[in-house]
Swiss-Prot record:
<dbReference type="InterPro" id="IPR047873">
    <property type="entry name" value="Ribosomal_uL16"/>
</dbReference>
<keyword id="KW-0687">Ribonucleoprotein</keyword>
<keyword id="KW-0820">tRNA-binding</keyword>
<comment type="subunit">
    <text>Part of the 50S ribosomal subunit.</text>
</comment>
<dbReference type="GO" id="GO:0019843">
    <property type="term" value="F:rRNA binding"/>
</dbReference>
<dbReference type="GO" id="GO:0000049">
    <property type="term" value="F:tRNA binding"/>
</dbReference>
<dbReference type="InterPro" id="IPR020798">
    <property type="entry name" value="Ribosomal_uL16_CS"/>
</dbReference>
<keyword id="KW-0689">Ribosomal protein</keyword>
<dbReference type="InterPro" id="IPR000114">
    <property type="entry name" value="Ribosomal_uL16_bact-type"/>
</dbReference>
<comment type="similarity">
    <text>Belongs to the universal ribosomal protein uL16 family.</text>
</comment>
<dbReference type="GO" id="GO:0006412">
    <property type="term" value="P:translation"/>
</dbReference>
<dbReference type="InterPro" id="IPR016180">
    <property type="entry name" value="Ribosomal_uL16_dom"/>
</dbReference>
<keyword id="KW-0694">RNA-binding</keyword>
<dbReference type="GO" id="GO:0003735">
    <property type="term" value="F:structural constituent of ribosome"/>
</dbReference>
<protein>
    <recommendedName>
        <fullName>Large ribosomal subunit protein uL16</fullName>
    </recommendedName>
</protein>
<dbReference type="InterPro" id="IPR036920">
    <property type="entry name" value="Ribosomal_uL16_sf"/>
</dbReference>
<comment type="function">
    <text>Binds 23S rRNA and is also seen to make contacts with the A and possibly P site tRNAs.</text>
</comment>
Amino acid sequence: MLMPKRVKHRKVQRGRMKGKATRGNFLAYGDYGIQALTCGWITSNQIESARIAINRYIKRGGKLWIKIFPDKPVTEKPAETRMGSGKGSPEYWVAVVKPGRVLFELSGVPEETAREAMRLASHKLPVKTKFVSKRDFEEMGGEE
């Protein structure tokens, strides 16, 4: 499971998800990837589950990059606890994802294999996604 080794602040505020991703919104390493279409929190368990789904499908062929990291702690209070008496303890970590963010990248496999692997991974994630390739960004005249 992904989580920071150490953090400056143990508990953080929830915040708001506004606008589109301005960083990490194009393919930097691989030839194919999945890009978020909606905003949301992706937990470290969901990232790990998607990673396993991709790796099981590509079976040792190709290389996978995880482009998001869960660096935000989410606190929870125990069940059946009255309100008050401070903020709960950190229970799990999430990555804040905005529309346009590339979540996973893949290279070294045929496009059909990559497309199916990314489809399997997208079912494990709480945000809507789309399959993207290097060719898509070259046609748009994107940042490269």
